[in-house]
Amino acid sequence: MSDAELTYLAECAGKSTAIVEIGSWKGRSTLALACNTPGTVYAVDTWKGTEQQGDELAQHEPGWLLTEFKRNTAGLDNIVICEGPSVEMAKLHMGLTLDMIFIDGYHTYEGVRDDILSWTPMLRPGGILCGHDYVPTYWDGLLKALHELAPRFRVVPNTTIWTTEWL
């Protein structure tokens, strides 16, 4: 994730008291959110990776990725670890009212669609729905889901972050 992308997340976090991050990986974007929000970041991930990260994960012991995330975010008491598939975690946290949702999990059509449909019922009107890796030549499924479910989105200049205000 680029410095410009981290700066955008930090700015959004400063206006948000309840944030869900779907796809936390090693915690770099989680840090940008947690260090700049006056509230809580719910970090949602299986910490098992995807096929794209298979080679990197294969070099380590099971559980390594979550351990790395915890090490990288140590000392921040405003991060709630939600270990499991995004849709299941959304069901467990259905009572939340969210100011921001950041999607950087599975970039397939089904993955992005399910993340949007599962979490946006908790997003307050005017809240921020955004995500990472808007790359038209690479993530076709992500683009298809966005055009169907969040057609008013825009891409933040000089980044691959897509964003929209939720109505």
Predicted features by range, described:
Residues 4-167:
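S-adenosylmethionine/decaboxylated-SAM
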